[in-house]
C-alpha cells in the first residue's frame, strides 16, 4: 500500500561482502514488477527525482511510470551502486536512466540496473549541460547516432527488460526534421522501439541547462509527425507540458506523455492520473490523505537517520493554490532542515493549513 514500509535491507547489496553480485540477483527477485504502461511518466530530473520523491509520487499515482535521476555508467559500474540506484520496491514501476557513451560500460551498468529490479533502462541523449558533454554524455550524442545505436544494442544484449532512449529533436544548427528522423531511424535499427522526445532542440554552447529547458521553441507537431511516419515505434512526448490537461491535449497522436517540472512543482497534478489516463481508481482522494499515506514512509526513513528535509522538500508544492500553502512551504522549508527534525514539523505545517482554511471559509 502507498506509504507502507516495504524495503529490502540494502546491506545485502554490499559488493565487497558478496562477490559476483548474487545480492543483486536476490534484489531483482524481490522487486519484480508487473506489466506497465508508458501512457504517462514522470521525467528523470537531476536533484529532484530521487528515491524519496518517487516514493511520494507513488502515493499519488500507482500506475504512472517513474524515472530515477540520471546515473552515469562509470558511477554505476565502479561506484556504490546500492547507494546510487537502490530503491524501495513500493516505487515500482521505476525506470533507471543511464548516461554514457561506452557500449561495454553501458551494458554492464544496464545489467546492474536490471539486477536491482528496474522495469526499464533508459539512455540519456538529451541533457545539454557542459558537465555531461565533457564526458560524452547527453544531447551531444545526437550528432553520433551510430554510436548511440551501438550503445543501445549492447545494452539490449545485456538485459531482458526494455531499453529506451530519451532525446531532443536536434542540436545546434541541425534541421530538426532531418536530424530527428535520421537519429530515430538509425537507433531503432539497433533494436530499441521506444523514444521519449523532448520537443526542443538543445543548444550545446551559449545556453545553460535551465535556458535549454525554456528558450528553444517547442515543436510538438514534429513529434506527432514522427509517430505518424513511424507507427511501429512507441513515441512519448516530453517538454514544456504544464499540466496533465496540457499533456493529454498535446499528446494526442503519440503513445504517451512525460511530465517534468509540472509533476514536481505541483505534484497534485498526478493525483487524478490513474483515473484519467489508466482507467483505474485513484489511490488518494485529498491532499491530506496523500500526506497521511506518505507519513509511514517518512517515519521509516527517519528511523534510518534520513534527514526530514531530504523527503519533505518534494512535498512543498502539494498544496499549491490552497489556503495556507505559503505557510505550509515556509514551515517545511525552515524547520525540516533543523537537526533532529521529525514528524512534529509535518504536523505543524498541517495545522497551519487548517487555520488558513478556516479563515478562508
Question: What is the predicted function of each stretch?
Answer:
Residues 72, 100, 127-129, 169-173, ...:
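Active-site-proximal loop/turn and secondary-structure-junction residues that shape catalytic pockets
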Residues 130-147, 176-178, 206-218, 277-281:
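Glycine-rich tight-turn/loop motif centered on a GG-T
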Residues 27-34, 45-119:
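Glycine-rich, positively charged N-terminal anion/phosphate-binding segment
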